[in-house]
Swiss-Prot record:
Residue numbers binding ATP: R350, W351, E352, R361, V362, R483
Record remark: domains: Consists of two distinct domains, a catalytic core and a N-terminal extension that is presumably involved in tRNA binding.
Family: Belongs to the class-II aminoacyl-tRNA synthetase family. Type-2 seryl-tRNA synthetase subfamily.
Reaction equation(s) it catalyzes: tRNA(Ser) + L-serine + ATP = L-seryl-tRNA(Ser) + AMP + diphosphate + H(+); tRNA(Sec) + L-serine + ATP = L-seryl-tRNA(Sec) + AMP + diphosphate + H(+)
GO cellular component: cytoplasm
Cofactor: Zn(2+)
Primary gene name: serS
Keywords: Aminoacyl-tRNA synthetase, ATP-binding, Cytoplasm, Ligase, Metal-binding, Nucleotide-binding, Protein biosynthesis, Zinc
Any one GO molecular function term: ATP binding
Gene3D superfamilies, alphabetized: 3.30.70.1920, Bira Bifunctional Protein, Domain 2
Protein name as it appears in the record: Type-2 serine--tRNA ligase
Organism: Methanococcus aeolicus (strain ATCC BAA-1280 / DSM 17508 / OCM 812 / Nankai-3)
Length: 522
């Protein structure tokens, strides 16, 4: 790497000739910039190429290689200069400013894959002939340097370079971590009966009035028949899977502070997949203007509403297990007394963009979430049990399924690099899918159970420790109620008489849809 800096140290008053002599003495002392540089790497250290005095400013041109980088050098000069001139000349340093700072980083291959790379706080230039990327900072001061934005930008770019494989495609952290190739099928079950139903369950649900599209994107109103079926599956999953493993029920918050998502590193991986929440300002007078304009114009004045909202401070829970890790934030635990919690208290939210179509991929969905914390062996065992009992339930219902190694564990999704010393499991995620026979072009399934082990990912992020300093892992399993129902209806259809006794016993008598003249449309 090459670093070239043009900046200045700004003093509290004009620099006198005597002060200049003392400052020059400091600038000529190479030991200041060689401190900490390994023997034999002196040429990589910072060098002051040029300097000049102008009023109360010391203008510097500094170059360096990897060691004692130029931006570190200008900060390093501050203390010895002050020791030399502070008391004697009664002057202080007011600020450090970098007017222009160019950092050239070598990229071994496929530099064109970074063509659209954007780095916050700086500009980028690609040189495809030399396979280098240059990041350029302009007009940054002491406060930015103290926040280490330069080092973070360098680290960010180097990570992006490392993530570009020989093919020029981005590498995914999931594929790097997995001991078994993602999408490998590890178990499957073929239905014993002949599955003849082949209609789209979303379309049929709408025709029958079991659901109605809500005005929000990816949202549905579930009417009594669909709700009855959802609750039946909720009971079955609790009885046949979760209670057998001994989870204790909790009520998890669903409004999650952004700082929790930051510690989870969810904001790195899938920031575009969440609903962000902005609390309102508590100013009745300002809202009175909003209401008045709405009543006069007979429309919602969105522009005015934006001004009445604070910055986003929360997200609607996209993973459901977020509060579990915050609960243990910086706590001492005992892995001899592991924890198993389950939450089924409300909706989960994902922004799917254009990916939301039918009932199998929605923005607002119900699921049962189990979470466990303990020794690695315990966490793996519990995860495997949740999957085993889910598969057994599907077999009891004669639902055709397969289980595969997941290619998108939620805590790794969208992430390209892990710079911390994290322990990962051999398989971060198993995904169980129910077959959708109405999809003709391919053998497609709906993911109904996602069984995850996180290793030390969340333990590290939330500072959780065992009181004997033993290894602590976490894991979670999500049972998607809506998706279990869709997979069931896709294979059995909507005729109650064709359903298995296990389901009919839970439901009893099916309720009717509300009588509305204009709905459902025939």
């Amino acid at each position: 790497m090459k670093f070239e800096l043009n900046g200045k140290i700004i003093f509290s008053k004009e620099i006198t000739d005597d002060a200049k002599k003392d400052i020059i003495e400091v600038l000529n002392d190479r030991t200041i910039l060689l401190k900490g540089v390994p023997t034999g790497k002196e040429e990589e250290a910072s060098k002051i190429v040029n300097y000049e005095f102008k009023g109360n400013e010391l203008i510097l041109n500094i170059i360096s290689g990897t060691y004692a980088r130029a931006h570190e050098a200008i900060i390093r000069l501050k203390k010895p200069i002050m020791e030399k001139v502070g008391k004697i000349h009664k002057m202080g340093i007011r600020d450090i400013k970098i007017d222009n700072y160019e950092i050239t980083i070598n990229a071994p291959h496929n530099i064109d894959a970074l063509e659209n790379l954007k780095v916050p706080e700086c500009e980028t230039e690609l040189n495809e002939e030399e396979n280098t990327i240059k990041i350029i900072f302009k007009n940054i001061g002491d406060s930015e340097l103290k926040r280490n934005i330069v080092d973070r930008a360098i680290k960010f770019v180097k990570t992006e370079i490392d993530n570009i494989g020989d093919s020029g495609e981005e590498c995914d952290l999931t594929y790097e971590v997995c001991g078994i190739a993602p999408n490998t099928i590890v178990s499957e079950y073929k239905a014993e009966r002949t599955i003849s139903y082949n209609k789209d369950p979303t379309e049929e649900s709408e025709k029958l009035g079991w659901v109605k599209r809500f005005s929000g994107k990816g949202q549905w109103f579930y009417t009594p028949p669909m709700t009855k079926l959802l609750r039946a599956f909720e009971e079955l999953l609790m009885e046949e899977c979760i209670n057998k493993i001994g989870f204790d029920e909790c009520l998890f918050p669903k409004l999650i502070p952004l700082e929790v998502m930051y510690k989870m590193r969810y904001l790195e991986g899938l920031p575009e997949g969440m609903y962000y929440v902005s609390p309102p300002k508590r100013d009745p007078e300002m809202f009175k203007e909003f209401v008045n304009e709405m009543m006069i114009k007979n429309e919602i004045p969105i522009h005015k509403l934006k001004d009445l909202l604070r910055n986003p401070g929360y997200v609607l829970a996209p993973a459901q297990c977020e509060p579990f890790y915050q609960f243990f934030d910086h706590e001492l635990v005992d892995i001899d007394n592991p924890v198993k919690f389950v939450d089924k208290s409300g909706w989960t939210y994902r922004w799917e963009g254009g990916g939301s179509k039918g009932l199998d991929r929605v923005h607002e969905f119900l699921r049962i979430e189990t979470v466990q914390m303990g020794a690695p062996e315990f966490v793996n065992s519990v995860r495997d049990d949740t999957l085993k009992y889910a598969e057994k339930l599907a077999e009891k219902l004669d639902l055709e399924y397969w289980t595969e190694v997941g290619d998108d564990p939620f805590y790794l999704e969208g992430r390209k690099k892990e710079e911390r010393n994290i322990e990962f499991p051999e398989v971060p995620k198993y995904e169980m899918r129910l077959w959708l026979p109405h999809v003709k072009d391919e053998r497609k399934g709906v993911a109904v159970t996602s069984a995850n082990v996180h290793g030390t990912h969340f333990v590290e992020g939330f500072g959780v420790k065992d009181y004997k300093n033993r290894t602590v892992w976490t894991g979670c399993t999500g049972f998607g109620l809506s998706r279990w129902v869709i997979g069931f209806l896709a294979q059995y259809g909507f005729d109650y008489n064709d359903w298995p006794e296990l389901i009919k016993d839970k439901i009893g008598e099916m309720p009717n849809i509300p009588k509305v003249i204009t709905w459902p449309k025939k």
